């Protein structure tokens, strides 16, 4: 069954109450979406900026091979973002957000413990899966605040780049202190925040 944009009447019922005494506050929904976006972007940023250095340091590969690994990671992310829309239409936003972020956690947690080719396979899988959540998160935010689509789009696209830049600076500072391998280990826990997607209303 095709999954269409939530009609305004349904959105109103989601944010004001579903008739059973459960009220979903707009600020609460946005807070959950921000947490999900934060965890997603921080993890992606950590891999984007440090994957090449990680595989060079841990597996002693040459820079060209390390760049191929980064290319594969970014390519999988682009594919995930592109296909995230149709996947969301098919399965629904809440399921896709939860499955994309929290579902990527087991693979992300394995990355620091496998060999070179295992790392490549896992980061490709994680990149594709976690990137597919972006369109679902954005559409959820737009439906919650249908009269402020421009502002919401700007905020979430701004978060995409802003959080990525801030995370890159933070992880760079942290890598100088504890090392790149430990940074990867710390970042691998970020997708666990996808569990917060279960707090989103089922009607959204």
Annotate each predicted stretch with a short phrase.
Residues 86-137:
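C-terminal transmembrane helical hairpin of 12-TM major facilitator-type secondary transporters
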Residues 25-81:
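Extracytoplasmic gate region of multi-pass secondary transporters
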Residues 145-180, 184-187:
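A late C-terminal transmembrane helix in Major Facilitator Superfamily
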Residues 53, 135-144:
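Intracellular helix-loop hinge segments at the cytoplasmic ends of transmembrane helices
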């Amino acid at each position: 069954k095709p999954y269409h944009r939530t009609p305004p009447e349904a959105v109103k019922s989601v944010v004001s109450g579903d008739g059973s005494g459960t009220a979903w506050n707009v600020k609460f929904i946005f807070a959950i979406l921000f947490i999900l976006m934060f965890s997603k972007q921080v993890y992606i940023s950590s891999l984007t900026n440090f994957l090449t250095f990680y595989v060079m340091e841990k597996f002693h590969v040459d820079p060209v091979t390390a760049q191929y690994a980064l290319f594969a990671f970014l390519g999988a992310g682009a594919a995930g973002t592109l296909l995230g829309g149709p996947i969301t239409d098919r399965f629904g936003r809440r399921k896709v957000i939860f499955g994309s972020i929290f579902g990527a956690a087991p693979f992300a947690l394995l990355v620091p413990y496998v060999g070179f080719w295992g790392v490549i396979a896992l980061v490709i899988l994680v990149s594709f899966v976690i990137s597919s959540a972006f369109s679902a998160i954005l559409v959820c935010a737009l439906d919650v605040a249908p009269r402020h689509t421009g502002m919401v789009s700007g905020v979430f696209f701004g978060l995409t780049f802003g959080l990525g830049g801030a995370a890159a600076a933070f992880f760079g500072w942290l890598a100088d202190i504890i090392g790149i391998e430990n940074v990867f280990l710390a970042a691998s826990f970020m997708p666990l925040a996808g569990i917060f997607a279960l707090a989103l209303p089922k009607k959204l």
